[in-house]
A protein has these predicted regions:
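Catalytic core of pol beta-like nucleotidyltransferases
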Residues: 1-26, 32-38, 47-100
């Protein structure tokens, strides 16, 4: 995974600040490939309730400013299958946890 512990902390803090403390955050896409270079930060957020478009925009802007990287956020409601894209992303994603 090509995220530093500090980047992981920032992601979790920003996402939870915008969507609530009870969301789950997963990383998917090219940042999971240690051999790759560059790329945006693709996040899959599982939320107990669907966030507003404004919440999504604020989270994206906060993350892009804090990380100085492009960020894409896909949000699914916990307990629902989500879109076909979200199901594919989830099948390849890794949960983000606060580094020790």
């Amino acid at each position: 995974m090509r995220l530093s512990p500090d980047q992981t902390r920032v992601i979790l803090q920003c996402v939870r600040q915008q969507f609530g403390a009870d969301v789950g955050v997963m990383l998917f896409g090219s940042r999971l490939d240690d051999g790759a270079r560059g790329g945006d930060v693709d996040l899959l957020v599982e939320s107990p309730s669907p966030p507003s478009l404004l919440q999504r925009a604020r989270a994206t802007m906060a993350l892009e400013a804090a990380l100085n990287l492009p960020v894409a956020i896909v949000v699914t409601q916990r307990g629902t299958p989500g879109s076909a894209f979200a199901r594919i992303a989830r099948s390849q994603a890794q949960w983000l946890e606060v580094p020790a």
